[in-house]
Curated annotation (Swiss-Prot):
HAMAP family, per the entry: Flippase_ArnE (MF_01869)
Keyword set includes Lipid metabolism: yes
Keywords: Cell inner membrane, Cell membrane, Lipid A biosynthesis, Lipid biosynthesis, Lipid metabolism, Lipopolysaccharide biosynthesis, Membrane, Transmembrane, Transmembrane helix, Transport
Protein name: Probable 4-amino-4-deoxy-L-arabinose-phosphoundecaprenol flippase subunit ArnE
Function: Translocates 4-amino-4-deoxy-L-arabinose-phosphoundecaprenol (alpha-L-Ara4N-phosphoundecaprenol) from the cytoplasmic to the periplasmic side of the inner membrane.
Length: 108
């Protein structure tokens, strides 16, 4: 369930990015942006509901830091979906997040 909450939250963030990119273009782009915005709201809302279920089952001290995976997924999406630059320091930070999530996952 935690993975579902993370994935839906990340999909919502990616849809938000698509939505704001659509606002820059011509009128048909606005309609696509609105579609992306509704998709973002649906993903984020669903992710929130699943997150609430996760909090019923896991300690918040374990569950919340696991959301660090979102930083990893969003960085990968930024790099490979939106062609955004990611420098070495950012990758090192991502590696540290993954080590922390792995350590917490061993406790859960």
């Amino acid at each position: 369930m935690l993975a579902s909450a993370c994935l839906l939250t990340c999909l919502g963030q990616i849809a938000q990015k698509y939505a704001v990119q659509g606002w820059r273009g011509a009128f048909p782009g606005v309609f696509a942006a609105l579609r992306s915005l509704w998709l973002a709201l649906a993903c984020l809302g669903s992710g929130l509901l699943i997150w609430l279920l996760v909090l019923q089952r896991l300690d918040v001290g374990i569950a919340y830091p696991m959301l660090g995976v979102n930083f990893v997924l969003i960085t990968l999406a930024g790099r490979y979906v939106f062609n955004e630059p990611v420098d070495v320091r950012h990758w090192l930070g991502i590696a540290l997040i993954l080590v922390g999530v792995f350590q917490l996952g061993r406790q859960a």
